[in-house]
Amino acid sequence: MTQFFEGNGAVATVGEQAVSDLIFGVDSASPANVMLQNNLSMLEWVTRNKVYPVFWGRNLNGDGCLTAQEITYLYLAGCKIAAIYVPDGERNTEEKGAQDAAAALKLAEDLCIPRDAAIFTETNDTETTAYLKGYAQG
């Protein structure tokens, strides 16, 4: 038996094991408001089985990135947004981390994302501690 509920402290069952404080979110390359072939939006398709994401992760930059219209759509649906910046080039100096943080902040400001909102960065195995420090402090 598998059951999932909202991430508001409700108990979910996975197999026979109870899981409390389950937080479900989505990280998608596709906009939440894109219409699919079944005439549902991506968000509607995700929630069709009563699984409601607490957050929807979307890239601030790159192809098909987050838009103001999608922000409004998610806001009206009661879903928080995890804004993700995807850096390019080498990620090995504190200066580059600070530059990427500044670029991420500019993109967020352009979308009217509040200044106190967290902006995540996509990471892989090439970032250095110095880069991440620069990004966090930037």
Annotate the PLM regions:
Residues 15-38, 50-134:
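Substrate-binding cleft of extracellular glycoside hydrolase catalytic domains
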Residues 1, 5-13:
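Non-catalytic propeptide/linker segments at domain boundaries
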Residues 42:
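Non-catalytic, usually N-terminal nucleic-acid engagement modules in DNA/RNA processing proteins
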Residues 137:
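Acidic, glycine-rich loop-and-strand cores that form catalytic or ligand-binding grooves
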